[in-house]
């Protein structure tokens, strides 16, 4: 990876350090999307300030083949495309990202998501729908921004890139994997030790990334359905981990208030796969979870997940910090107690 120097005396290499830090790694889901419209550069800055370990970039290609950071393949729920460029609507009545050049995408304003099906929308605590003038940015711009923040702030955030709709891109004669890997290489991401994950739902594309395109980067296979031990073994041949819904790991609460935990994490770890779960939202906790802290305790301590995607990454970071202090405080107390006992015995 490209060397990024924090100061003149510091080592100028950023490498992944997940193995040396306590779980979970905290992934800012589409940036700090619980506070600002998703995938905006403003949300990236806030996520970095909140000390997220990784900041997510969902990537779609523009009509002219430029990787842009945008979650959906269509623009309807997150932009004003309908009013700004009405003539680019398809026969299906939707505005598709791949039908717009980068220059055209730059004319749109990004908003908070309009979809009425999101349960947290009823809470009224998300960014106002029609406020601000947020823009669509390219993957390269997001990487440059994060690199700059890594240089100027005492925190090193990684990137977590999702390849959206490889099959849909192929139908439009676009190769999203090649385009994204080219941008990543240009910005120094070319080693499994680099502070980056690639993720994708398309299992055939994940295999292609590893075999045909031969990327050395760490890959997460996204799964929408639960995976058994046999499937996990197959995934482990090409991927470094799995990304799954929270409900695949903790399914409910027992009568004695203990969590109902599946075998997924245990089976994944048996195949040397990390488990990253999505999406933790303080304003959309499952009904069986009393508090955010309790739910995080179940996910991390009881279930053993390795990473958490969060709309409010600061909440998970703060919980992790408090837990580390609690654990380390307990160790310090035990150590002092043991040393005191040793001293007493030596004086006898």
Report the location of each language-model feature.
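Phosphate-group recognition and catalysis centered on beta-loop-alpha active-site segments
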Residues: 1-348
């Amino acid at each position: 990876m490209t060397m990024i120097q924090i100061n003149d005396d510091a080592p100028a290499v950023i490498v992944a350090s997940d193995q040396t830090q306590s779980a979970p790694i905290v992934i800012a889901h589409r940036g700090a999307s619980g506070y600002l419209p998703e995938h905006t550069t403003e949300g990236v800055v806030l996520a970095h300030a909140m000390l997220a370990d990784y900041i997510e970039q969902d990537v779609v290609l523009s009509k002219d083949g430029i990787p842009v950071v945008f979650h959906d393949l269509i623009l309807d729920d997150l932009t004003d495309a309908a009013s700004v460029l009405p003539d680019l609507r398809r026969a299906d009545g939707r505005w598709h990202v791949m039908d717009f050049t980068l220059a055209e995408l730059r004319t749109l304003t990004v908003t908070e998501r309009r979809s009425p099906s999101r349960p947290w929308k009823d809470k009224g605590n998300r960014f106002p729908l029609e406020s601000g003038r947020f823009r669509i940015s390219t993957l390269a711009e997001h990487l440059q921004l994060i690199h700059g923040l890594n240089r100027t702030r005492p925190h090193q955030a990684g990137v977590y890139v999702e390849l959206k709709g490889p099959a849909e891109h192929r139908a439009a004669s676009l190769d999203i994997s090649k385009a994204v890997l080219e941008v990543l290489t240009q910005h120094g991401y070319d080693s499994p030790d680099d502070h980056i994950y690639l993720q994708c739902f398309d299992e055939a594309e994940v295999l292609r990334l590893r075999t045909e395109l031969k990327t050395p980067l760490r890959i997460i296979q996204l799964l929408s359905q639960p995976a058994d031990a046999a499937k996990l073994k197959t995934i482990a041949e090409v991927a470094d981990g799995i990304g799954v819904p929270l409900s695949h790991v903790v399914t409910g609460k027992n009568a004695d208030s203990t969590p109902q935990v599946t075998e997924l994490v245990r089976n994944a770890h048996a195949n040397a796969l990390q488990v990253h779960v999505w999406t933790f939202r303080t304003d959309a906790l499952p009904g069986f979870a009393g508090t955010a802290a309790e739910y995080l305790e179940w996910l991390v301590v009881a279930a053993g997940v390795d990473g958490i995607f969060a709309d409010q990454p600061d909440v998970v970071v703060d919980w992790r910090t408090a837990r580390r202090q609690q654990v380390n405080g307990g160790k310090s107390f035990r150590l002092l107690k043991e040393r005191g006992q040793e001293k007493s015995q030596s004086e006898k």
